[in-house]
């Protein structure tokens, strides 16, 4: 005769099924790390993920279109504006990666930044990048129109520990040949302390909340059925095992 699974066993089965249905995602990495580049730069996109034995074939997508390259690294020797967009990859044993955006700009100077949104206390690194690595002299970095660093050559601007007041609009300027060139402005935002993020992370995403609610309902229903059928089975056994005594009337 069939028996109901205990509630805990049901939850374990559902949880295990949920985990196996979500394989690990691949990850796209940029080399160099900048996702804002100038035309004619070299860009390498690397796909990190699990591969089957002796098979490192990789799928690449650019703006949703499958690329012919099937190598773990996708190399662009002379990047063009049309190479801008979102890139995704997938290995043989991984789910498709989240998209990574690449922006190709036209100009003499480009202010490159590792992250445009930075947590308080984390470093900020800015690079005044020139087209085809043309020599640049008298480089200046500006925030909200005010000069923050000056160097005779081209050096990076590094802020060891970001503070809220470091948020703002940044650009760089320098001399190329006999011309004074400037980059486009880049908005950098320094986030509030981690405590605010900790509070917000206390609340689960909507799909996890839905899963917990469904599991709670299933647990309650299964528990009720489990004990109901158990009482019914016990009553049936007592009826079968009970003895009936007949007596003659007067």
Curated annotation (Swiss-Prot):
- Would you tell me the Gene Ontology cellular component terms? external side of plasma membrane
What residue ranges lie in the Extracellular compartment?
A: 17-208
Q: Which residues are exposed on the Cytoplasmic face of the membrane?
A: 226-250
Q: Name one GO molecular function term.
A: IgE receptor activity
User: Domain Ig-like C2-type spans what residues?
Assistant: 23-105, 99-189
Q: How does it sit in the membrane?
A: Single-pass membrane protein
Kindly list the places in or outside the cell where this protein is found, as annotated in its UniProt entry: Cell membrane
Q: Which Gene3D superfamilies match?
A: Immunoglobulins
Q: Which parts of the chain span the membrane according to its record?
A: 209-225
Metal-binding listed as a keyword: no
Instruction: Say if the entry is tagged with keyword Phosphoprotein.
Output: no
Any one Gene Ontology BP term: neutrophil activation
Chief location = membrane
Residues with an annotated glycan are 56, 63, 180
This protein's superkingdom? Eukaryota
Q: Which SUPFAM superfamilies match?
A: Immunoglobulin (SSF48726)
Q: Where is the signal peptide?
A: 1-16
Coiled-coil zones: none
Sorted alphabetically, which PANTHER family does this protein's record hold?
IMMUNOGLOBULIN FC RECEPTOR, LOW AFFINITY IMMUNOGLOBULIN GAMMA FC REGION RECEPTOR III-A-RELATED
Q: What does this protein do?
A: Receptor for the invariable Fc fragment of immunoglobulin gamma (IgG). Optimally activated upon binding of clustered antigen-IgG complexes displayed on cell surfaces, triggers lysis of antibody-coated cells, a process known as antibody-dependent cellular cytotoxicity (ADCC). Does not bind free monomeric IgG, thus avoiding inappropriate effector cell activation in the absence of antigenic trigger. Mediates IgG effector functions on natural killer (NK) cells.
Instruction: Report quaternary structure and partners.
Output: Forms a heterooligomeric complex with ITAM-containing signaling subunits FCER1G. Interacts (via transmembrane domain) with signaling subunits; this interaction is a prerequisite for receptor complex expression on the cell surface and intracellular signal transduction. Binds the Fc region of antigen-complexed IgG.
Q: Please state what the protein is called.
A: Low affinity immunoglobulin gamma Fc region receptor III-A
| The organism of origin for this protein | Bos taurus (Bovine)
Gene it is expressed from: FCGR3A
């Amino acid at each position: 005769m069939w028996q109901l699974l205990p509630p805990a066993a049901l939850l374990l089965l559902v949880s295990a099924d949920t985990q196996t249905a979500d394989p690990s995602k691949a990850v796209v990495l940029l080399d160099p790390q900048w996702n804002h580049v100038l035309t004619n730069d070299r860009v390498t996109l690397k796909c990190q993920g699990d591969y089957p034995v002796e098979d490192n074939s990789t799928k690449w997508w650019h703006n949703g279109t499958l690329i012919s390259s099937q190598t773990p690294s996708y190399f662009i020797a002379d990047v063009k504006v049309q190479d801008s967009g979102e890139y995704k990859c997938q290995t043989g044993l991984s789910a498709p990666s989240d998209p990574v955006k690449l922006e190709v700009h036209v100009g003499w100077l480009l202010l490159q930044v590792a992250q445009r949104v930075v947590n308080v206390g984390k470093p900020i690194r800015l690079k005044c990048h020139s087209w085809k690595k043309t020599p640049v002299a008298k480089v200046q970095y500006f925030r909200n129109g005010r000069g923050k660093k000056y160097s005779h050559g081209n050096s990076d601007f590094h802020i060891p520990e970001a503070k809220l007041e470091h948020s703002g609009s940044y650009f760089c300027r320098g001399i190329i040949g006999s011309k004074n060139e400037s980059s486009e402005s880049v908005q950098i935002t320094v986030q509030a302390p981690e405590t605010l993020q900790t509070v917000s992370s206390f609340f689960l995403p909507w799909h996890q909340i839905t899963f917990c609610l469904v599991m709670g309902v299933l647990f309650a229903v299964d528990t009720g059925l489990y004990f109901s059928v158990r009482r019914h089975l016990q009553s049936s056994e007592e009826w079968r095992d009970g003895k009936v005594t007949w007596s003659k009337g007067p």
